[in-house]
Amino acid sequence: LKIAIIKSIINNTAIINSNFEKCMFIDIQFNNCNFSNTIFENCSFIRCEFNNCKLTGCDFNENTLLDTNFINVNMNYTNITISDLKNVYFKETRLKNANLQNNKVKNIKFQEADLTQIQIFQTSLNGIDLSKCKIDGIAISIDDIKGATINQVQALDLIYLLGVKII
C-alpha cells in the first residue's frame, strides 16, 4: 500500500528524524523544508523540486527519482543507495560526505555542487559533467569516474586512481 502526495507546494515544513516508506511524491515543490535525518525507503519522487531545503543525513534507499531538482539544498551526509535516478539536477547543492552506492543513473546533472569527501561506488558517472563542482577528497573507483568530464584542477584530485605519485 503506497501513500501518494500529488500536485502540492510544501513550504517551511520541518519533518526530522522520520520514516517514509513506500510513498509517492508526484509534482511536489518543497520550499525551505527540513527533512534532516529522515529515511525514505522505497519511495518515488516524480517531477519534484527541492528549493533551499535541508536533507542532511537523509537515507534514500531503493528510491526512484525521476525529473527531480535539488536547488540550493543541504544534502551533507546523505545516503542514496540502490536507487534509480533519471533526469535529476543538483544545482548549488551540498553533498559533502554523502554516499552514492549501487545506483542506476541516467541524465543526472551537477552544477556548482559541493561533492567534497563524497563516496561514490557502483554508480557510474559516465557522461556527467563535474567540471563546475568541488570534488576535493572524492572517493570513487576508476570505473565509476570513467567518462565523466572534469577540469584540470580536479584531475589532481583523481590522480590517485592511476596509482602514481606527483612530486
Describe the residue ranges of each PLM region.
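Tandem repeat scaffolds
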Residues: 1-167
